[in-house]
Amino acid sequence: MLLVISRCPPGGTIRSHFSAWVVLALALLSSLVAGPLLAAEPLTTFRVELDRGVDRGQNFGSLFEVATSDGELVLGAGFANQYNTRLRGDRHAVQFFVRPTRARRELAAVELPRPNTLCGTYLVARDERLYSTFGGLAAWQPDQKRWAPEAPVGGTQETMRVGNGILELGDGVVRYNGATILASPAVGSYERFFYALGRLCFYHVVRNDRPYRPFESDTDGFSRLYACPWVPGDGPVDLARAETLRLPVVGETTFAWGQTGSRIVTGSNIGGFYEWSAGTWRKLRDPQLGVSFQLYSSMAFHDQLLMGQYPTGRLFSLDGQGLRDLPGWPPVPPQVSGSSREAQTTTIYAGELFVGVWPWGELWQFHPDRREWTLARRLFSHPELSNQVIHPYDKENAGNPVGNQWGQRVTSLVTVGESLFASTSAKDPCAWDPEQNPFLAPDKWQAYGRVHELKLPGHLQAATRWTTGVTRLEFELRGAQLRIVQDGRELARTTVEGAAGELLKNRDQLRPVAWKQGIYGPFGGDSLTGQVLE
């Protein structure tokens, strides 16, 4: 600011004195107005106009991805496509991330209060609310730091937003906006619902209280896959229009579904792998009685669908080459056995890939630019890692009905707001029996069923409003601040801390933007146009 002071000379006029004060007042005013403007940090906006089309349960994928010219940062936005052990991620939640390519970020962690008194839980999120699904449905209330009971849905307690309505996937029953669209069958059970690509999919299983066995006749029992055409407004599901596939083994069901492009896939609990496309089911892998091969999670990652597998504990890739093992994804710690491992959960958080692995409660982190796996943390502090046993507490638990009951699961990886929430469990989320399991006294059992809130700088997520036709999403950068706006209304904002924040404030110019591409897989809506405003 240039401050000009004019003194009225002896004998000077009142008018000249008044002029001097006017100059002074104007100078002060200009400093108040111009000061903040001069200090304001530049704004960069990624403006995306997109039409998601009719909501048929599809995944919407990537909106854009871009790197800075010096290669220090990668930025992107999109809708994650993931399914973790019978629970699907929120398709309507949009993520905005900043990922340093070389600078390290510290993963902070806090433990939330326990949602139940069981040795496990599974989490799910909808509309940026976090729910615990075991021991009664409960919603996390961050302001009050407590879990609040919710009315149960039944089954896996799964709900999903479809258009402006809510689809409830209950215990053999499906409802849309409270109205039943599929009732329980007269014989057997409908299990593991999945809605995608305008198809309500599920397993119809008739076991007749007998173990797995090869199919002989419908009277003896069966497992059958269904894909039922349905969109909001159709009313009840018409089973006569369903596309079905009778499976080779009675009792087959699933832990994981997935959707990639125009395909729906599911892996059965005894190794069968099946695909629906263009109105037809087909078998890609035969089930094998007595041979373990189970898929527990699915997630879009660039142009692949990654699926977490047991007993390797690795990710398998479904791409144009079929379903194939990815050695070292993730690796095995040298201190533990490489047997009976399970990649149960997968997610994208802050632009990186995270995987939860049984039986030692490992949380692995993969950096896409460095192509590097890191053991982010172990979600249990006991017992010590050992390659002399396969599961924790194998020796102490010997003789009990389930020998590997105290293996350590990472049951959920769920993103909400700026955070990643991870939950733990024993093999079964049972109640602790101090007489049967005294080795977990007095409070070791409480490590099972914990919910951990993890934070890595550079992640922001928000629930988007459903629109018919085009909607505008804007992803803003100002200094170290991230902001998401939909049709002029702010959805969320955060400030990126640490080294990532400093890089963001001093970022280099941007390389050309890749629209409709990125870590969340190809864009899955009807249309998208983008521009960068600076």
Per-region residue spans from a language model:
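N-terminal secretory signal peptides that target proteins for export/translocation
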Residues: 1-18
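Carbohydrate-binding surfaces in secreted/extracellular proteins
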Residues: 466-497
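Boundary at the C-terminal end of the N-terminal hydrophobic targeting segment
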Residues: 34-40
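Flexible glycan-contacting loops in extracellular carbohydrate-active proteins
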Residues: 390, 494-527
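Bacterial N-terminal signal peptides
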Residues: 21-33
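Residue-level marker for isolated small/hydroxyl-bearing positions within beta-strands
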Residues: 76-78, 132-134, 168-170, 202-205, ...
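Extracellular/lumenal carbohydrate-interaction signature centered on repeated Trp-anchored short motifs
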Residues: 462-469, 522-526
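Trp- and S/T/G-rich repeat-edge/linker motifs of beta-rich repeat architectures
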Residues: 40-62, 82-118, 125-200, 207-255, ...
